[in-house]
Amino acid sequence: MMGSPLRVLLALPLALALRVDVSRPRTNDWKRTQCGGPSGSADLPTQWAAQVTTTSPPLPEFPRPSLVRGGSDRDRGNQSTWSTLNGIWEYAPADPTAPPPTGKTLEQSILVPFPIESCLSGVAPNSTAAYVNRSWYRLEVTVTATAGTRQLLHFEAANWQTTVYVNGRLLGNHSGGYDRFSVELTHEIFGASASRSAFSGSASATLELLIGVYNPADRGAQPNGKARISAITSPGGDTYTPASGLWQSVWIEEVPAAFIASVQLDANTSHLTATARIDDASVSAANMVKFEVIDPASKAVVASGHSLAGSPLRLAIPSARLWSPGAPFLYDLRVSCDACHDAVLAYFGMRTFTVANVTTPSSGGYTQVHAALVKGGDLLVANLTVKQAEAKCDATAGCVGFTFEASASAGVHRTYLKGGQLKFTQPAAEAWQSFVKLPAKMPRPLLNGGKIFLAGWLDQSYWPDGIYTAPTEAALTFDLEAVRTFGLNTVRLHQKVNSERWYYAADRLGVLIMQDAVQKYGRASNATIPLFESDLKRMIEQRSNHPSIVQWETFNEQDCWQVFKTAPHAVADIVRLARATDGQHRPVDTDSGGGANGLPVGDVNDIHSYPYPRPVLPTARRYAMIGEFGGIGYFARGREWVPGKCHTYLNASSPAKEADIYVNMTRQMIDLAPTGLSASIYTQITDVELECDGFLNYDRTSKFTPAQTAAIREANEKLIAVASAQ
């Protein structure tokens, strides 16, 4: 991506020369298991599973593309500063009463970073009864490090409680299944150096890494999304296989003694505010940091300045190129500290995403926003008058309908129901009509100051072969590329936090992300509260630099919010926590489709409407969103997690029927847009285990022909264009 002039510019002031030699356990013990439901059912790997082998580390890409030390290659990083530990590790279930098995060879082999329950791990339990909630991982590495440097062992994510021993010494504990954490190895390398290398100024030591992981999944109090241990044997409709253990990359990094640990970025359409934190055991506050904004096309420095470590610097960006779905331009940011002998490369996008009252077209008049005839679960005709709907209903068709009257006081912004069934009695269909009195202004989301309709789909980011972990980088990127293939612009990442490389791909591709906080799905207790708050805060801290993320979703439906009733842990306090943690002041969706959505907090009035969309109106301060709808499913034989067990909100008899129903739903969205509807999230991108309502099958094959895909894309593009203009 970058040319050689930038690579020279990014040369480290201090030469780092990390070398890691890994003593891998026997690879012939590893074998991919069945990628399917209960033992004996389908085997459903994705096309990328065959690329996962033990001969080279899986997912070898640099895990932290937002902060590259001493280089400009966000895929490979600077090879002299880091080394992946992904690959085969020793593995064994843990006895909670026994001491750590220091110095002992473990009996099995596991492929990191795939969750224990995944078929790519090689050790997946074949039944709920065989579920393992405590495990040990063991690996021996020989690290050769440069004198005057420090060595860090990074875990991108491990689910849920992690204990790290090195050469028998406890180095750290961590609770949380979705965030990066690290321990320092410097003392173990230099303090216990086994040998001196041929060149001076370095040390070499062999380290035994022993990692303990405990995951009670849904039996614990911690947020764990939709995972259910019971789903291993008996998958549920919307509960899925757990993902335990080391499920994101593990790696070693060499850094200077005082190093740039993080860079916090807040960019709008004209300025960048940047703050660098220095990890320095002596005097971090006295370190002066230089910031240089670089245009990646011309390699020119377009803005620069200095500030003390920990102090924000505000830089004006001349003639700024803005980030948007249609033009996702990313600036590079070189951050250097001469006193630290350190330099890193970050990146950012210039954009704003706000909620503001904007003028309503045709304000003061009445607008028909919804009129349709539905029979037997299928949308027959949209945009009907009541008389037209009645004409299509007869005793055989058996329609039941509702009408809405347009009588309302001036300025009233709501829908009125004029009751009653039509004359037909068989409840096989519905026909209804809705009118809304349009106010002069209403809340809308604005991207870079302009109105935008967010049309997207729900993404649970589960994989039949990796569960939480995509098998390869190409697989990881595939789902985001599919957003554009189908003409959408948004993803709501549901009940999960993905690896940083996923967000980097969204930044590059221009996909807007609504990011869920992970819930305690249906089983929250008071013990959940501090764990939820900690997870939420760390999620925002570690992901807030990404321009693709435009909104935080604090709660979902009835999953978790009911235990957050008393200050300082009430729902409103959680919304304030999200705002305070996020330096970019993104909108907060209090509760997508749940009871807390009715509280006068947050920025979004968000309903769920299955299967068909229904009217939702903005409030005085919150824009209107249908946070989930659809759930149309064609069940593709040979592509099911458990054959014959698929379910969905609305079954379609063929892919063509599924496509037709969806296209009609986009027309309904266009009808709703004049009343303030500003976002719609369709359920969902892929089938997930028994929930078979994706545009894609669970193995990522498409359900649609190219012509059907083109029709869906055209409908979505029209929805975005027309609704954004309202």
Spans of features found by a protein language model:
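Low-complexity, Pro/Ser/Thr- and charge-rich linker/hinge segments at domain boundaries
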Residues: 231-243, 257-264, 350-360, 440-447
